[in-house]
Swiss-Prot record:
Known role: Formation of pseudouridine at positions 38, 39 and 40 in the anticodon stem and loop of transfer RNAs.
Cited InterPro entries: PsdUridine_synth_cat_dom_sf, PsdUridine_synth_TruA, PsdUridine_synth_TruA_a/b_dom, PsdUridine_synth_TruA_C, TruA/RsuA/RluB/E/F_N
Protein encoded by which gene: truA
Gene3D superfamilies from the UniProt entry: Pseudouridine synthase I, catalytic domain, C-terminal subdomain (3.30.70.660), Pseudouridine synthase I, catalytic domain, N-terminal subdomain (3.30.70.580)
E.C. numbers: 5.4.99.12
GO biological process: tRNA pseudouridine synthesis
Protein name stated in the entry: tRNA pseudouridine synthase A
Residue numbers annotated as active site: D54
Keyword tRNA processing: yes
Amino acid sequence: MMQRYAVGIEFCGIRYRGWQTQQAGVPSIQETIEKVLSKIADEPIILHGAGRTDAGVHATNMVAHFDTNAIRPQRGWLMGANSQLPKDISIQWIKEMNTDFHARFKATARRYRYVVYNTLNRPALLHKQVTHVYQTLDVDKMMLAARKFEGTHNFETFRAASCQSSQPVRHLSHCRLTRHGRYLVLDIQADGFLHHMVRNIMGCLLEIGQGCYEIEHIDTMFAAQDRKAAGVTAPADGLYFIQAYYPEHFELPQHPLGPHWLNLPDEIPNI
């Protein structure tokens, strides 16, 4: 009998070309995990993720699911997979699910954090795990600007030219920027994200922080509905997929949002 499992995955995206399986020879998170699970199950496994992260993007709790005929205790799946996965990928939890659960299509919202290391000297130990910005930033202005993205908007200007989504309207339930010592953290949640959307919003906020334009210019960007009207795309290095949300009846395990070395609260910043 086919059994569906949900899993929570943590990964460092530095060595991978994103979540989605690529052409032969190009490493991806999805394919790497599928190979290990297929070996444990002794049958082909297809993994369905809640999101599709870009090359170099990280995750603290990417929710995914797979179906299998193999009978294994949950601890067996967890320990078996983690003993064979590369050290930069780890399954944090696993749970048996009914077949009405789908990691992608049943998700009601997704949440990211983008981490900027804002000091003169670049960090060595956090190489490619944060985005280093050495310039002095007007953080108060950036915090106000971030709130402009909340609500329902047409994000045509803030998606990649190659984005394949059929429509660019998204609802952001929150978009908050906070400072934690040397770190700036953008915490952003939406019903769905477009390709490069978070990185383009972060790029806009960084330019505002550097005095390139005023907060009100965001309205002009939205009105233009043209990618060329916005600023640069922020690097993938500082971006973390931290959570996907589902109806409560699925009872998925609670997992700290992370990134864990920052020790941030899970609650939405109240600013």
